[in-house]
Amino acid sequence: MNDFPTLQNFFSAWFHQDWEMEHDGADAVIDAWREAEDDEYVARARDELDRLLARDLDDPALGAAVRALGSEYDPTRDGSGWREWLTAVQRRLHP
């Protein structure tokens, strides 16, 4: 059973293999998703991010978890770690 259905939808639908063709960067993807979804759905994503980050996984394990949720984006290619990037996503999803 998937503990993070909202994040799975977000990562698999918005950070798919061609996401770079549709957006100028990862922040643009996050902003577009935030604007496309209602506040309640975005709040669920924030809650799921809280739970994922609370698992206290190391960076490789966080990366594996996010990839398992369907993300094709790898923040390490942009000089960031997985925890750092997920924390930035969390901040960006706040109103």
Stretches found by the model and what they are:
Residues 54-58, 91-94:
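Charged/polar positions within long, soluble alpha-helices
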Residues 2, 40, 44, 77-80, ...:
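Alpha-helix boundary/N-cap detector
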Residues 66-95:
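Amphipathic alpha-helical binding modules
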Residues 1-32, 90:
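Short terminal alpha-helical segments
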